[in-house]
């Protein structure tokens, strides 16, 4: 139904959309969703992809700073820990849960939640429904741009003043099931003290393994429960450094 590709609103699936924005020269922001519109993909005026971590931070900054909303922030384990830094800045409670929006929705139904978000682009906010809505998130970002009179890039720079500049990248390793299982066992047994030059400082294991390095960068490894795929996530101060972490991880994991 999607010409043979997964309908995930990420940059590799949205190349024609990015090209359209670049070629037009007069598009301030581009909004994309998946097939049922619960996940959001966002582009700036230069056709550069804005990932879900940045969208979550933008939404929190707008809802608290401009709309004076309150409430807890609940995010999936794969979301950047910089969200915690923003929550501390605004005095908000912060909770990390397992991956899967059902873990967020349950809390939204029973507690006062400002925002719930996933790395996949599924985000819900207060005042709407306790479920992901990519179109509503995009409209909220556009409202932020209109009311502030600022570009998306300018608003992202305001976020960076609070949490610092960062880039996030993800790679999927398609492996034989037995190889995937062996890597998972190594993670369970704490067999990775470093990934190439990146020395592990601490590990979090809420849903998968998130390895933090001494400079604050991190790598997350999580096996898919439905297919022979290992998902690797990395965050650093530049795109190049994030990709370097992913490359070092792949080399270490495959031995």
Report each predicted region and the residues it spans.
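Catalytic-core signal marking the mid-to-C-terminal active-site face
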Residues: 150-255
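Phosphate-binding chemistry for phosphorylated carbohydrates and sugar-nucleotides
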Residues: 1-148, 161
């Amino acid at each position: 139904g999607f010409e043979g590709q997964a309908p995930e609103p990420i940059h590799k699936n949205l190349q024609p959309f990015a090209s359209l924005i670049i070629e037009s020269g007069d598009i301030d922001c581009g909004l994309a969703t998946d097939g049922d519109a619960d996940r959001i993909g966002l582009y700036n005026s230069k056709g550069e992809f804005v990932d879900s971590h940045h969208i979550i931070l933008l939404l929190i900054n707008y809802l608290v700073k401009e709309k004076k909303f309150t409430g807890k922030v609940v995010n999936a384990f794969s979301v950047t820990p910089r969200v915690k830094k923003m929550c501390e800045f605004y005095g908000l409670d912060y909770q990390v849960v397992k991956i899967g929006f059902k873990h967020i929705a349950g809390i939204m139904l029973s507690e006062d939640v400002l925002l719930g978000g996933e790395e996949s682009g599924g985000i819900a906010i207060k005042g709407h429904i306790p479920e992901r809505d990519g179109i509503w998130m995009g409209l909220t970002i556009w409202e932020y741009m209109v009311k502030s009179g600022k570009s998306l890039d300018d608003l992202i720079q305001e976020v960076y003043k609070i949490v610092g500049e960062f880039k996030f990248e993800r790679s999927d390793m398609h492996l034989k099931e037995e190889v995937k299982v062996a890597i998972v066992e190594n993670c369970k047994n704490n067999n990775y003290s470093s990934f190439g030059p990146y020395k592990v400082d601490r590990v979090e294991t809420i849903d998968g393994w998130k390895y933090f390095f001494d400079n604050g960068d991190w790598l997350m490894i999580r096996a898919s429960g439905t297919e022979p795929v290992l998902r690797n996530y990395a965050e650093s101060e530049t795109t190049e450094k994030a990709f370097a972490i992913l490359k070092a991880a792949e080399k270490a994991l495959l031995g």
